[in-house]
Amino acid sequence: MLSIFDIYKIGVGPSSSHTNGPMIAGYRFVQQLLPQLNKVARIQVDLYGSLSLTGKGHHTDRATLLGLMGNQPATIKIGDANQTLREALQTGKLRLNGQHDIAFDYHQDLLFHQDNLPLHENGMTLSAFDTQGQQIDFETYYSVGGGFVATAEQLQNGTATADVTVTYPFTSADEMLHQAEKHGLSLGGMILRNELAFQEMAVIDAKADQIWRVMSQCMERGFATEGILEGGLNVTRRAPSLLKKLEANAAIENDPMEVMDWINLFAFAVSEENAAGGQVVTSPTNGAAGVIPAVLMYYHRFIKALDTKQLKDFLAVSGAIGILYKTNASISGAEVGCQGEVGVSSSMAAAGLTALRGGSNEQICMAAEIAMEHSLGMTCDPIGGLVQVPCIERNAMGAVKAINASRMALKRTSKCLISLDKVIETMYQTGKDMNKKYRETSLGGLALIHLAPLCE
């Protein structure tokens, strides 16, 4: 069983699968090399499939090298690390794990391949060689979405994640509802009891507060930072100007729909920070990192100030929904399109908000189902391989959809026709049926309608 904090992780933008995952892979590989690190004279990085096709726009190349240098997504000081990396590329010397220098030629030692490796669309192989050109070690990694990374052996053996026994196990939404009903528990209460198999409640409290703090700080940076996002599209950050407009109009307008502008603002701020490579919370991916903070801030600002108890309830319920998608379908845009990113995040947010609004366990799952039902078929076709267009606006749309799905579920008096389990199954099958052009390759859709300059 996964922890909700496997779904909610602190990292850096712009992508959990294409930035955080490769950084983790690079870090793991260099740790694997430590016993013979002094023998390493050369490292070769081979990127495949979506990691190659959108790798430059998603900073996959940079992230992999930063991982090899000893950095991890949760703790990296991205400004300092990027400066160190720039110096390394200029001098042609890469310092492995911060302690062993090797020669590195970006154009010879980091290779992009359009074909896929056999087990997943996001594959990469890292190889180490000695001074004689003999291979010392190699490993193939798959970045399977949401910052989850597995070796080929782990994927083949089904051991990519630790198998932790919890008090109330479930593998489907129906089983989750049955367990809660059988033991007379709310979904939030049941999931938090399961979390005790991973850590004490004091640690859960601290992690929940940290998640909200990072989300809020990210949003504040987004409010304050003006300018053009890098990458060549000349996309202007919109959050600062929208905030000024909303604050200026607060006293003179009486627009009942203005709350939607605030929700858009919250999502824009986080998504623009993510696009700029800032620190975000993967929820469940970086490409969808603006949805859940926007819904939480909507509740905090317009309904009721969040306390730790409410925050834990939201994260528990929404995290459980994310776990269902992760284990029974996919949260990888390269595997199932954006329905697996913004679609899943919207579904998670709808469930969490419904819990905060006092919805029943059944209404929570109904809200999650509604949000996904109306995300089915959503493509992942980022222009220029950048997490900018359509990604930033799509996060805002996902947040608004989540709130509407929650309201629909709370007001409904009849039973729904489609269960959450069925819509998860449908999402996965739809993604597998989707042409690869629309699964994070930038080979179709909007990515071809508007051709962007190649990212350097």
Where are these regions (language model features)?
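C-terminal domain-closing interface element
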Residues: L65-L85, H113, G343, M348-A355, ...
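Secondary-structure capping and boundary motifs in well-ordered enzyme cores
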Residues: V259, P284, A288, Q310, ...
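Alpha-helical support elements that line or immediately flank enzyme active sites
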Residues: S17-L34, P293-A305, A350-G358
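Conserved phosphate/anionic-ligand binding catalytic regions in large, soluble enzymes, centered on
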Residues: Y8-G26, A276-V295, C338-S346
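Accessory "access/gating" subregions that flank catalytic or transport cores
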Residues: M201-G333, G337, G445-E456
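Hydrophobic alpha-helical bundle architecture
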Residues: L306, V317, I323-A396, M408-L417
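Extended hydrophobic packing segments that form well-structured cores
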Residues: L417-E456
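C-terminal regulatory domains involved in ligand/effector binding and gene-expression control
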Residues: P73-I252
